């Protein structure tokens, strides 16, 4: 179902997006905070898209975390809020979560009602607002938003590397070099009993030190090269990860645009059908009124004729 695909199973949150913040109880001024602005259709569409992107990131992060043991990930609603702000919707994580909760609850009610109706005349989209409220349905719900939520498709999660990988630090390499050189420093002080012994030992130590430095340079160079290679690989992986995210966002945006075009076309057809039905109803109403008027005139004429006949007899 579309409801399961979009992950609408969220806990209910008291209050909608238009509910004002709690007053300053116990304060001296008693001033209430400003009322939050209403969500526009475009903001809701960005919210839906941001939730899809955030859920994709969560799935990819979990897969990468199981494989590589990455660090903590950004909370889902904080990620949704960041996506919204990048696309011009300045809403916080709490606002996004509350608006989605209300949107999910209203969608479930409408979806359940539409699945139970037997005729198109009982559809939620044909009802007046007062009739909707009598049937405990949302007073208003945007048709385009409903169609996107109902027919939305989330792309499959692709396991990728997490951004939690940290590059190898230069301090670690330097500390390894210091540890390797420390034995030489400890053994570099010769103990001589005579000038000849000192000279011989210095020559021997110089030869040994040269050989040791040659041997040590080889693994050190290998370690440095290996560290730089791993850093480059991680940088390339992070770069490819960012490019994949951008491509996915572009693909989602194009998909949303195509869905909007299809929805607008369907809404136009539905509106044309509704106008045709209304015109037909008005035409039938006019014909009925005309028939009633003609019948009333005929009855009045007969009554006048009867009164005239009675007057003539008198």
Curated annotation (Swiss-Prot):
The keyword Zinc does not apply. GO terms for cellular component: nucleus. Changing residue 189 to D: Phospho-mimetic sequence variation. Normal transcriptional repressor activity but enhanced DNA-binding affinity leading to compromised microbe-associated molecular patterns- (MAMPs) triggered immunity (PTI) responses. Keywords: DNA-binding, Nucleus, Phosphoprotein, Plant defense, Repeat, Repressor, Transcription, Transcription regulation. It is found in: Nucleus. The modification Phosphothreonine is found at residue 189. This is Trihelix transcription factor ASR3. InterPro entries: Myb_DNA-bind_4, SANT/Myb. PANTHER family: TRIHELIX TRANSCRIPTION FACTOR ASR3. EAR motifs are involved in transcriptional repressor activity. The keyword Transcription applies. A motif (Nuclear localization signal) lies at residues 84-91. One of its GO terms (molecular function) is DNA-binding transcription factor activity.
